[in-house]
């Protein structure tokens, strides 16, 4: 809510298209979560796009390697505790494989250890996807610059709210 107005920010993002279809559509999770999740190749997350590219390319490890790389996260704030669609990514000499594509969500009633929240994993049933490594890396290289060209209205996304001085974005 922004005053008396409820906001529904528009989030533009680059989607994963496999044989012309969205991964959300293929995973059958799209019907439930399609409006609620986006990739990190998005206008609100443009500063995270290079790191996301590196996770997808296998150059950096995801925060939770046992769950895989989060492909889609919350459209509002990118918080993984809202749930996310993830895949285990294996990079080989000539191919890149996405396996165990699953919806991961917090198990608020599950056991916790060391302050961590347990995550429940719901497999989508998708077969592993194998990509040609050269084509895959070419697509990732093109993605980051394209994110900067996506439309983004900061006021619409954040709302007309008071910003604390540390949120002004000034650099000293």
PLM regions and their residue ranges:
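Intrinsically disordered, low-complexity acidic regions enriched in Pro/Ser/Thr
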Residues: 1-172
């Amino acid at each position: 809510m922004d005053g008396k107005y409820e906001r529904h920010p528009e989030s533009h993002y680059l989607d994963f298209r496999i044989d012309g279809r969205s991964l959300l559509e293929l995973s059958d999770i799209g019907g439930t979560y399609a409006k609620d999740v986006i990739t990190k190749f998005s206008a609100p997350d443009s500063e995270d796009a290079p790191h996301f590219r590196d996770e997808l390319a296998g150059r950096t490890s995801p925060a939770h390697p046992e769950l895989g790389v989060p492909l889609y996260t919350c459209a509002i704030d990118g918080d993984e505790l809202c749930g996310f669609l993830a895949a285990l990514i294996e990079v080989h000499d000539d191919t890149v494989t996405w396996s165990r594509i699953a919806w991961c969500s917090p198990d608020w009633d599950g056991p916790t250890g060391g302050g961590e929240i347990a995550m429940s994993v719901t497999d989508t049933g998708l077969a592993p996807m194998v990509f040609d490594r050269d084509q895959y890396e070419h697509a990732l290289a093109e993605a980051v610059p394209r994110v900067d060209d996506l439309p983004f209205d900061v006021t619409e996304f954040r709302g007309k709210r008071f910003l604390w001085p540390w949120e002004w974005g000034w650099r000293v």
